[in-house]
Amino acid sequence: MKVLICYFTGTGNTRLCAQFLANHFIEEKNDATLYEVEVGNDNVPNPNDYDLIGFGYPIHAFNTPEIFAGFIKKLPKAINKKYFIFKVSGEPFPPNNSSSHHIYRKLKRKGYRLIMEKHYLMPYNIIFKYKDELQKQMYLYLDPLTKVMAIRLTRGEEDKIRYNLIHTVWSFLLRIEWIAPKINALFLHNKKKLCTNCMMCVNNCPTKSLHVTKTGKIKTTSKCALCMRCSLNCPTKAIHMGIFQPWIVTGGFHYKKLAKDESNNGTYINYRTKGYFKLFRKYYLKQNELLRKYNIEIPVKYNEENQLENLKK
């Protein structure tokens, strides 16, 4: 089976998810091609040349990012072309379940048929930084969970996708978030005292909207996707994110380093988790059940008192 995986990524979590999926499809004796959606990457593979299409994106305010919705709009028509969706966010809140409804409608009109959709949790790149133990837990779960998806799709399994009306309305109303980057573009700039002019932010911007002005300032245009790539990865923390400055997360993600840290057991979400992250427990319990169903080892070791299965008692 020939699989095409098209995705947009801001700070790399969706790219990582896409790469894991591609690797697992190949393990299952399929061909897998990756295509990253960004301005200037115009060599778009034709979906009609593939047996199965994957579409992936980071959830922005319970929605598909505008740049990815624009990509979907430009796709050629097809005839009953099967596709799946994988999406990434930092929290398991129910309105995320309807984040794809907008592109689902577009794809249906073009002749594409949705057969599976999966929501993966990865660390926030905005609002606040997740603790290392939770970052490790999310990273370690991503690999086996994408393996399950690749196995299921290779076997020809399909899910019945239903979008909750209330969640869909929430998603529609919050699509106003598409306006936020355009407004915030007026205020985003570099802090000249901290900026070393390394040009990392300009060169790596997925929308190619960051640029250097005649006065030497780094500014952006209304094409900005507010993906947070520039602020997350700036080595000197020199990006001022305008209106969203109080919510920035810096320092990047270092998953491979965390994975090797034996002092970090990666079980931040467990039976005894309290506060905000208590809301994450049912998500991980459900993922454990899914992994067991497909005979895949749970990637972290919970002690008996903290295992999520205690929620059932």
Stretches found by the model and what they are:
Residues 33-40, 215:
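Short gly/ser/thr-rich secondary-structure transition/capping motifs
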